[in-house]
Design a protein with these regions (language model features):
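Short, well-formed alpha-helical segments that are part of the catalytic scaffolds
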Residues: 11-24
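Acidic helix N-cap motif at the loop->helix transition within catalytic regions
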Residues: 16, 41-50, 72
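Short helix-capping segments at alpha-helix termini
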Residues: 26-28, 52-58
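Glycine-rich, basic loop-to-helix element that forms the pyrophosphate-binding segment
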Residues: 64-81
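Short aromatic/hydrophobic "clamp" motif used to bind/position activated sugar donors
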Residues: 86
Length: 86
């Protein structure tokens, strides 16, 4: 099983392209775990729309209650993955 961990924070301009890149890989991933670190832009809305339009892949979105910073947020995302390969 292959998992992708994403740590997001105010990534609205790039998140759609990042998700498309993961989705269009030759070897499909089994899950995408996204942890948003209290974005103040529309990052979460874009991700939620992506999840609704891509039901053939397991995408889970988690939203932090407080900003953890990049390292802790990415560590959290990795810890939520179920794959043998991350």
């Amino acid at each position: 099983m292959i998992s992708v961990a994403m740590a997001t924070f105010n990534g609205e301009p790039y998140i759609q392209e990042q998700l498309d890149s993961i989705y269009n890989q030759t070897r499909k991933v089994d899950e995408i775990i996204i942890v948003d670190d209290c974005s103040t832009d529309s990052t979460v809305r874009v991700i939620e729309q992506y999840i609704l339009s891509h039901k053939d892949i397991d995408i889970k979105l988690y939203k932090n209650e407080e900003n953890l910073g990049y390292k802790k947020n990415f560590k959290k995302a990795i810890s939520l993955c179920h794959g043998d390969y991350v």
